[in-house]
Design a protein with these regions (language model features):
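Inter-heme linker and motif-flanking segments adjacent to c-type heme-binding CXXCH motifs
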Residues: 1-157
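Short, solvent-exposed mixed-charge patches
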Residues: 159-161
Length: 161
């Protein structure tokens, strides 16, 4: 077993369809039921903002470059300063890359550019950041040296916030 299955988070007897007729929410647990580490970031993003970005496309194509039309269920984030073309998909763009353990990871452009903008101004409405700046911030290195990274310096439980 390499990670959580569908029923770890979703209730198999509730609908996950996004409409007004769906019964229940489809979720039976939240991230904080298993994870207790808080993030060192502003108060806006929640866990799924970064760890479940809209990096997946179904039959609908969205013109926004860093956003698919459905949320991915690849929770791991590749913290290297590489974008989707070099760090998430194969050269043809037809498959998600896997590491030696068979795990995939979303790249920082998907995880961060839904809120931040790249150097061309593409992305969300917040500050412009390069992939290197995003990587340095997440890891707590470079201009962010000594900060400990986005997860590590905050040791208190989320319930204590």
């Amino acid at each position: 077993d390499i990670g959580p299955g569908c029923v770890t988070c979703h209730d198999p007897h509730s609908s996950v369809k996004l409409d007004n007729q769906a019964e229940g929410t489809g979720l039976q647990t939240s991230c904080t039921d298993c994870h207790t580490m808080a993030v060192k970031h502003n108060s806006f993003p929640n866990c799924v903002t970064c760890h479940m970005p809209r990096a997946t496309r179904s039959a609908v194509v969205n013109a926004v470059d860093y956003q698919g039309d459905i949320k991915t269920h690849i929770w791991k984030i590749n913290t290297a300063a590489v974008g989707k073309d070099d760090g998430m998909f194969n050269a043809a763009g037809t498959q998600v890359l896997e590491d030696g353990d068979g795990l995939s990871a979303v790249t920082l452009d998907f995880a961060c550019y839904s809120c931040h903008k790249d150097s061309e101004g593409v992305g969300g409405g917040f500050s412009t950041k390069t992939l290197q700046q995003l990587s340095d911030y997440v890891l707590g290195v470079g201009e962010y040296a000594g900060t400990g990274g986005i997860h590590s310096p905050t040791k208190k439980l989320i319930a204590e916030r």
